[in-house]
Swiss-Prot record:
Belongs to the globin family. The keyword rRNA processing does not apply. Red blood cells. Gamma chains make up the fetal hemoglobin F, in combination with alpha chains. This is Hemoglobin subunit gamma-2.
Length: 147
């Protein structure tokens, strides 16, 4: 897992303070389900996922996206212990939900894309580098329970 410099932490925390968890979370999960349709199988209970517009307008997708991003907010407060922060979620996604750990990497990359869209010029290459390191760390932590 990557080591976070003080600069990384400041960069991540600064942008995070401006993130609308509901909007960015819903858009991130929605885009994951549209761009990588095989991920939809984990969300059978979410109802209509038949088209991009159905997915992006689905209230359950938005609600779960917010939940995902809220948990990410907890990680941002504990960047030096991502594995510990995500131990229970890793266990849930591995043992109970059987989610392919590759999906965590995909979700992280989609989040970076959504942040770039939302923050435009403010999302500089340096900011992206810190966020890529963070989403890679989170994906690794969430995958830690897998054998």
């Amino acid at each position: 897992m990557g080591h976070f410099t003080e600069e990384d932490k400041a960069t991540i925390t600064s942008l995070w303070g401006k993130v609308n968890v509901e909007d960015v979370g819903g858009e991130t999960l929605g885009r994951l389900l549209v761009v990588y349709p095989w991920t939809q199988r984990f969300f059978d209970s979410f109802g209509n996922l038949s088209s991009a517009s159905a997915i992006m307008g689905n209230p359950k997708v938005k609600a779960h996206g917010k939940k995902v991003l809220t948990s990410l907010g907890g990680a941002i407060k504990n960047l030096d212990d991502l594995k510990g922060t995500f131990a229970q979620l890793s266990e849930l996604h591995c043992d109970k939900l059987h989610v392919d750990p590759e999906n965590f990497r995909l979700l992280g990359n989609v989040l970076v894309t959504v942040l770039a869209i939302h923050f435009g010029k403010e999302f500089t290459p340096e900011v992206q580098a810190s966020w890529q390191k963070m989403v890679a760390g989170v994906a690794s932590a969430l995958s830690s329970r897998y054998h």
